[in-house]
Amino acid sequence: MHSSLHALPVLQDNVIWIWVRGAEAVVIDPAVAPPVRAWLEKRQLSLAAVLQTHHHADHIGGTPELLQRWPEAEVIASADDRERIPFQTMPVRGGDHVTVLGETVEVMDVAAHTRAHIAFFLPNPKGAEIRPLLFCGDTLFSGGCGRLFEGSAEQMHQALQKLAELPEATQVCCAHEYTEANLQWAVAQQPNNTVLVERYREVRSLRAKGELSLPSSIGLERRTNLFMQASSAAELGFLRSHKDQWRPT
């Protein structure tokens, strides 16, 4: 059965991911409902499940409305975030494996951005054009990582090292299009890093044409993401603090 992956840009910089198999779809972190509903209905697709990486409003805001339209859809979210994602129907924790659209999905504990943040990894999605998939919310961005709102640099370092161990070809489906700004900062830190500079040029060109830079890949992030390359929690914490305060000149 044919599978496909789609990115739906919404709001200022959110990206809602839609994974389709046959006549059913899975939606990841729907910030808002109307564009998702319109996209699915135009293609005569039913909503099978919603995957929630964490509780922030720009990730769960559209889910209740989508459930009104497709009340049988599962909502898979962290068991440790029941109070903040009260409409979840399938609570999970890191290390769990669930079946979604006939595919095995591994739940990964990547707490740092929030205390109960999880990611979803599909190691072997069916479909000739589909490589391994990682839906990582606000933990790993292309060229960056999430702010430490409820977690520590140690937790983020552990989370990124865990993600770095995934296969290089894994598609990194993060929830925001922050790549250009992230790489602008990174190039300012390492202006002689030719791999980084070239990636920044590529992304600037894509964004100038109104195209997304996502999905990235684990291999690309290993080569160009200073946070993933950090050798210690202390180094990551320094970089995160620096970027939080940095403004382009």
Curated annotation (Swiss-Prot):
Zinc keyword on record: yes
Cofactor entry: Zn(2+)
Annotated cofactor note: Binds 2 Zn(2+) ions per subunit.
Reactions the enzyme catalyzes: an S-(2-hydroxyacyl)glutathione + H2O = a 2-hydroxy carboxylate + glutathione + H(+)
Pfam assignment, any one: HAGH_C
Entry protein name: Hydroxyacylglutathione hydrolase
UniProt signal peptide: none
Organism: Synechococcus sp. (strain CC9605)
